[in-house]
């Protein structure tokens, strides 16, 4: 078999099908450690730099198993193809290289059906390269999106395939870790862009201000979408309760941990808000199914590869956080678990507020890489180890 080009969605399918492949990442060590291919199941991955292949071809080739299919990943497609040609020269039989480079993995969205009823269908769109989740709610021939990424063509294509008109798009907060797609979706479709003025008041986005407790529905009735203000991760953080059963929680409630309140440089002030919100969350219906905006790793997914957990289980899993009754102790806990935020987060916030504009290449550069939005990534990992 000659070398061939494959798509990011094919790589994901091979990984969840547990195919016998080796993922060969030929980026430099720094980029590899910052962001790499992840899967729900264990798989073999090697990091051997493209530059090493150029300078030490024989030694690099010797590191690869000849009895397995090789799938090459690099920052750019051309570099991966170059390494694939080296392996073909050395008589490797099944070698593929990723179309579009690592950015295509970073932008990949996987639609997973959460629930299908006569009156509605709810989808989770998993972005493995960012460890993030967005959502789509369909009723009749209308669809609403929640926290869409900048891969706007995916969402519009998803709607078109189902003969749906996009009527609303919601943000849970002003995102810092990825470039949001609501503004462009609204511009291209005429859908209403909803956001909390606590985050968006200084932006140049043409958004419609949310009101705490208000409800939305579809033209044919369908499920309700209830707005719940949950400040803390940001002052305008908002959750959405769907059909009284699900809560799209953004970066407020995670399956492991809660949203970090320090990304705006006001850790103590926002930690106070988060402490109050945690009290509010504990009073919600504990049977609500939590649908988070991010996950730490695939271990949080259920057997259907969905990131979803009943609120009572989330509270129990994170009792080391939700169980802190004293506000001063909670704020100290947050401070003890703070860590530097990626430098690009400040710029991404400006882009999402429409205060700065960049071309597609720069936006992709900013958008690439796994999120760091949990308040206590280290503490949560220790608590669940």
Positions of PLM-derived features:
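Ser/Thr-glycine-rich phosphate-binding loops at phosphate-binding pockets of nucleotides
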Residues: 80, 170-173, 230, 249
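Short amphipathic alpha-helical segments
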Residues: 34-38, 84-86, 157, 181-184, ...
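Active-site metal-binding motif and surrounding structural segment of the metallo-beta-lactamase
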Residues: 66-71, 152-194
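Catalytic core of the metallo-beta-lactamase
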Residues: 56, 66, 70, 113-166, ...
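Accessory terminal helices/loops
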Residues: 2-5, 9, 21, 30, ...
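Active-site environment of divalent metal-dependent phosphoester hydrolases
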Residues: 30, 76-79, 153, 174-179, ...
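Generic beta-sheet signal
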Residues: 98, 194-197, 250, 293
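Rhodanese-like catalytic fold shared by cysteine-dependent sulfurtransferases
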Residues: 1-22, 29-69, 76-145, 152, ...
């Amino acid at each position: 078999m000659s070398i061939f080009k494959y798509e990011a969605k094919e790589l994901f399918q091979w990984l969840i099908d547990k195919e016998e492949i080796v993922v060969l990442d030929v980026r430099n060590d720094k980029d590899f450690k910052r962001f790499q291919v992840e899967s729900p199941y264990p798989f073999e991955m090697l990091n051997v730099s493209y530059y090493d292949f150029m300078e030490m071809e024989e030694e690099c080739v010797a590191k690869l198993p000849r009895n397995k299919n090789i799938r090459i990943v690099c920052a750019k497609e051309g570099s991966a193809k170059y390494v694939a040609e080296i392996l073909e020269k050395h008589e490797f039989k099944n070698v593929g290289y990723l179309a579009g480079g690592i950015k295509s993995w970073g932008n990949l969205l996987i639609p997973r059906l959460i629930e299908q009823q006569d009156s509605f269908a709810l989808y989770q769109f998993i972005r493995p390269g960012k460890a993030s989740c967005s959502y789509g709610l369909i009723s009749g021939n209308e669809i609403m999106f929640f926290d869409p990424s900048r891969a706007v063509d995916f969402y519009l294509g998803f709607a078109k395939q189902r003969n749906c008109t996009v009527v609303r798009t919601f943000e849970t907060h002003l995102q810092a870790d990825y470039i949001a797609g609501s503004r462009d979706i609204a511009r291209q479709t005429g859908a209403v862009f909803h956001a909390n003025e606590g985050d968006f008041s200084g932006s140049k986005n043409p958004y419609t201000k949310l009101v705490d407790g208000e409800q939305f529905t579809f033209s044919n009735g369908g499920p309700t979408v209830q707005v719940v203000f949950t400040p803390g991760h940001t002052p305008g953080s908002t959750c959405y309760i769907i059909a009284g059963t699900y809560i799209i929680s953004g970066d407020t409630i995670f399956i492991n941990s809660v949203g970090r309140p320090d990304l705006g440089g006001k850790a103590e002030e926002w930690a106070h808000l988060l402490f109050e919100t945690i009290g509010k969350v504990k009073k919600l219906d504990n049977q609500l199914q939590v649908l988070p905006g991010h996950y730490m790793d695939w271990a949080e997914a259920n057997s259907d590869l969905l990131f979803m957990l009943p609120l009572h289980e989330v509270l129990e899993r994170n009792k080391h956080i939700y169980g802190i009754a004293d506000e001063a102790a909670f704020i100290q806990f947050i401070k003890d678990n703070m860590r530097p935020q990626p430098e690009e987060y400040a710029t991404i916030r400006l882009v999402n507020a429409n205060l700065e504009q960049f071309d597609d290449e720069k936006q992709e550069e900013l958008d690439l890489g796994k999120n760091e939005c949990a308040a206590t990534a280290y503490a949560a990992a220790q608590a669940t180890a």
